[in-house]
From Swiss-Prot:
It comes from the Eukaryota. This is Translin-associated factor X-interacting protein 1. Its main location: cytoplasm. The keyword Coiled coil applies. GO terms for biological process: cell differentiation; spermatogenesis. Possible role in spermatogenesis. It is found in: Cytoplasm, Perinuclear region. Keywords: Coiled coil, Cytoplasm, Developmental protein, Differentiation, Spermatogenesis. Residues 144-184, 230-295 form a coiled coil. Interacts with TSNAX. GO terms for cellular component: cytoplasm; perinuclear region of cytoplasm.
Amino acid sequence: MGGHLSPWPTYTSGQTILQNRKPCSDDYRKRVGSCQQHPFRTAKPQYLEELENYLRKELLLLDLGTDSTQELRLQPYREIFEFFIEDFKTYKPLLSSIKNAYEGMLAHQREKIRALEPLKAKLVTVNEDCNERILAMRAEEKYEISLLKKEKMNLLKLIDKKNEEKISLQSEVTKLRKNLAEEYLHYLSERDACKILIADLNELRYQREDMSLAQSPGIWGEDPVKLTLALKMTRQDLTRTQMELNNMKANFGDVVPRRDFEMQEKTNKDLQEQLDTLRASYEEVRKEHEILMQLHMSTLKERDQFFSELQEIQRTSTPRPDWTKCKDVVAGGPERWQMLAEGKNSDQLVDVLLEEIGSGLLREKDFFPGLGYGEAIPAFLRFDGLVENKKPSKKDVVNLLKDAWKERLAEEQKETFPDFFFNFLEHRFGPSDAMAWAYTIFENIKIFHSNEVMSQFYAVLMGKRSENVYVTQKETVAQLLKEMTNADSQNEGLLTMEQFNTVLKSTFPLKTEEQIQELMEAGGWHPSSSNADLLNYRSLFMEDEEGQSEPFVQKLWEQYMDEKDEYLQQLKQELGIELHEEVTLPKLRGGLMTIDPSLDKQTVNTYMSQAFQLPESEMPEEGDEKEEAVVEILQTALERLQVIDIRRVGPREPEPAS
């Protein structure tokens, strides 16, 4: 490609030079006409044709390949651009800077794509969690719908029963009203008969009196005036009595006997009460039915919404990975992968796979690039250049970290943990190999998050956790083993389940019954176990060659972390402020004393010193006015307290009953 260079289009006709002219002007039209009259006749140079043929051939070869990518398709263009740079010496600096700018941009885009890979994995995890939640919600919804259907059927049966009772009561009321009307007519007939009999009786009495007067005139003959007056008065009394009787008939003709009225009134009152009760029951059942129908409709609406969301997620989300594909890739084959994947969810399987990939990459690396001497670089990693990879086994790293912890605990003059770590490596391997071992150990503990010894050492080394947390946890485990040994009177390494339970409750008096039950299950207790069953308690504190503890000790650590989170959450709730708001030293101290009244002054000062990053000697005394000036964001204070060994000292005082 480096043959003779043609000067084209340097000496072509002047018409090839582009001029900035207004497109619609007269001058523009004249120039266009002139250009049409004198067309270009300059031929394409040989160098340009060779470059085009070369580019066409390379692109054709790439198109024939099955695995060509956009990165490979750029390679012919990059080579042609390099030919330009080499052949055109005058423009070489400018063309080189252009090439470097584009290469830098491509490298930046590659790094950006690589940085987005974890986000893709996170999206996969979120999708899996959403699928699980949707399945759980659908199962719960199905169960609730079945319960609502059963309850609806029961309510419908109850409504039918109440309707039947209502109909029967209505028929009974109708029958009673009919009987009442019949009785009324009967008594009305009797009243009329009595009136007729009374009239007949009066008529007979008058006739008898008249006959008596006619048969014995001598008796009354002595005083006829008197008799006439008496008869007149009697007839007046009769007339008055007859008028009163007529008034009484008019006023009380429709009146029934009080006894019958009271009996019918009582019956009517009872029926009315029953009717009111049935109406109230019916109204209550109707309202419950309406509420259930509303719940049913809202449930159907939520179901449709969740179903549409599920379809949208299934359409847009990444499918669930098939983890069985890893068994043929991971070192050790299907048996080792089955052992690694047992009892783990997708998120944990990702960590396992990353550890396997990371360990494989570590074994392939012979050197690590130095991180430099920046202030953000830990002191034990400050080095410029290549650092040898010592390639120790996982077991060797764990044993080395255990030795470091032993020496740290035996150290009298405490220095910072990173400085101690580097001094330990210098003393162990010499100054020449200390940096290589520091990089090697750091890369290993950064990868193996599932290993207890490595993950805890990494957290302490990077300042994410105080070393007192590790020390306190070891002391707790040692104290628990001592208590179990004291309870083992025969020194056989065996305890009954009852003794095991007693030791746990005496060692951890603040743990709930549920937490004690979890520890017993982690130790080997089953619901079918009896109090007399024996337990080999020493096996609970064993460790494998890689430093992994038994499930019992792991459960102790999990409960410790959960208790710490719950303790800090109670503190946040007691303070009653948001995470982004500021909290003063007196308020934080008061919140701690409220949720944990058994705290002593020294412990509280230690917590305050950590939360506000003040030496205990510089902290203001309790009640001092300077306390209000010490403030910190609540979230920052809680994160600092999360680092140290903070736990409940005594039970929280119960709130007074109202």
